Amino acid sequence: MNAKAEAKESRFDLLKWLLVAVLVVVAVVGNQYFSAQPILYRVLGILVLAVIAAFLALQTAKGQAFFSLAKEARVEIRKVVWPSRQETTQTTLIVVAVVLVMALLLWGLDSLLGWLVSMIVG
């Protein structure tokens, strides 16, 4: 990991994670408790609690490390050379052709073995 990503754990990290867990439980229980209310209000309540929980989680050492990992992953994704549409289509057609050939070979082998067993048995 990156040296910047390795943040020292605070003594309040456990308290923050417990608070995150409590917020998630409150969201789940609140959604069930207020099931008679319109769905819009329940979704808004869950979103508010989720944003608060995410903010608290990102304040911990593990949360900061996760955020740093996500930023580095985004940078790496931008470096990937993605195949063109033509390359993707050609590769897909090759895979389909190989699957069909293998299916025919296995079907033929199964038929041959079935015929041999039926000749031996009866």
Swiss-Prot record:
GO biological process, one term: protein secretion
Pfam family name, one: SecE
UniProt keywords, alphabetically: Cell inner membrane, Cell membrane, Membrane, Protein transport, Translocation, Transmembrane, Transmembrane helix, Transport
Major place of residence: membrane
Family annotation (PROSITE patterns): SECE_SEC61G
Similarity annotation: Belongs to the SecE/SEC61-gamma family.
Assembly description: Component of the Sec protein translocase complex. Heterotrimer consisting of SecY, SecE and SecG subunits. The heterotrimers can form oligomers, although 1 heterotrimer is thought to be able to translocate proteins. Interacts with the ribosome. Interacts with SecDF, and other proteins may be involved. Interacts with SecA.
Name of the featured protein: Protein translocase subunit SecE
Taxonomy of the source species: Bacteria, Pseudomonadati, Pseudomonadota, Gammaproteobacteria, Pseudomonadales
Gene name per UniProt: secE
